[in-house]
Amino acid sequence: MNEIHKTAIISPKAEIDKEVVIGPYCIIGDNVKIGRGTRLINHVQIEGITEIGQNCTIFPFTTIGFPPQDIKYKGEPTGVKIGNNNTIREYVTIHRASVAGDGWTVIGDSNFIMAYVHIAHDCKIGNSVIMANLATLAGHVQVEDFAFIGGLVAIHQFTRIGAYAMIGGFSGVGQDVPPFTMASGPRAKLYGLNSVGLKRRGFSDETINILKKAYKILFRDKLQLKEAIDKVKKELPQIPEIIHLLEFIEANKRGICR
């Protein structure tokens, strides 16, 4: 049975699943869907075409599904999709998509999004991502699984953050950050492999050592990027992590942090 506070304002057109808790002064718009077991603490406002999965917890003064901060947007039917088991802390803003992408801002499963984070239109967030306080993602940013984004980080539009990457606090990121690496700085640069994070996630010593060798060839041997990629393909075992790393780099459009 749902637990809905008497001060909450919920559109009769909204689709609220079973066992949802909606606390005081929450506002839920017409085209909102909320999955089983999700909890809105209080003062949460959800608008637009927004789908929220199961067992999410959303804290006070978070807003989801409002129009994108894009002057080209004229009210087209775009939306937000949020998966299961996400924690979204106080004052987070998650905007619906613009018309320049596929029409959705997407957040996957099991993410931890800390207070005052901004996720702009058309962003694609994977699974098990951690975003610390006041991290800001511009439009069309992509963040792969298990990435960590530090506090007060600003990420330029269309930039990609690779899986298991770590971005240090106060950084400005304007180029793609490769998977498994660490980046930091006002114009973010790479500072090595995220070895500690990889060990915590259960990567074997053998895999980490292969990634370290790839990192050295790609980012420290002062080779042209294509030459470095060819050398990694020729000299190192093509384990899944190496394949993903190289495919990510080869797909870049904004350049790669080095």
Curated annotation (Swiss-Prot):
Pathway as given in its UniProt record: Glycolipid biosynthesis; lipid IV(A) biosynthesis; lipid IV(A) from (3R)-3-hydroxytetradecanoyl-[acyl-carrier-protein] and UDP-N-acetyl-alpha-D-glucosamine: step 1/6
Catalysed conversion reaction: a (3R)-hydroxyacyl-[ACP] + UDP-N-acetyl-alpha-D-glucosamine = a UDP-3-O-[(3R)-3-hydroxyacyl]-N-acetyl-alpha-D-glucosamine + holo-[ACP]
UniProt KW keywords: Acyltransferase, Cytoplasm, Lipid A biosynthesis, Lipid biosynthesis, Lipid metabolism, Repeat, Transferase
Annotated coiled-coil segments of the chain: none
Disulphide-bridged cysteine pairs: none
Gene3D superfamilies documented for this protein: Hexapeptide repeat proteins, Udp N-acetylglucosamine O-acyltransferase, C-terminal domain
Annotated localization: Cytoplasm
Enzyme Commission number: 2.3.1.129
A biological-process GO annotation: lipid A biosynthetic process
Top-level EC class: transferase
Keyword Isomerase included in the entry's annotation: no
GO cellular component, one term: cytoplasm
Signal peptide: none
Domain of life where this protein originates: Bacteria
One GO MF term attached to the UniProt entry: acyl-[acyl-carrier-protein]-UDP-N-acetylglucosamine O-acyltransferase activity
PANTHER family from the UniProt entry: ACYL-[ACYL-CARRIER-PROTEIN]--UDP-N-ACETYLGLUCOSAMINE O-ACYLTRANSFERASE (PTHR43480), ACYL-[ACYL-CARRIER-PROTEIN]--UDP-N-ACETYLGLUCOSAMINE O-ACYLTRANSFERASE, MITOCHONDRIAL-RELATED (PTHR43480:SF1)
Its job: Involved in the biosynthesis of lipid A, a phosphorylated glycolipid that anchors the lipopolysaccharide to the outer membrane of the cell.
Recorded family membership: Belongs to the transferase hexapeptide repeat family. LpxA subfamily.
Subunit note: Homotrimer.
Name of the protein in its database record: Acyl-[acyl-carrier-protein]--UDP-N-acetylglucosamine O-acyltransferase
Organism: Thermodesulfovibrio yellowstonii (strain ATCC 51303 / DSM 11347 / YP87)
The organism's taxonomic lineage, starting at the top: Bacteria, Pseudomonadati, Nitrospirota, Thermodesulfovibrionia, Thermodesulfovibrionales
Gene symbol of the encoding locus: lpxA
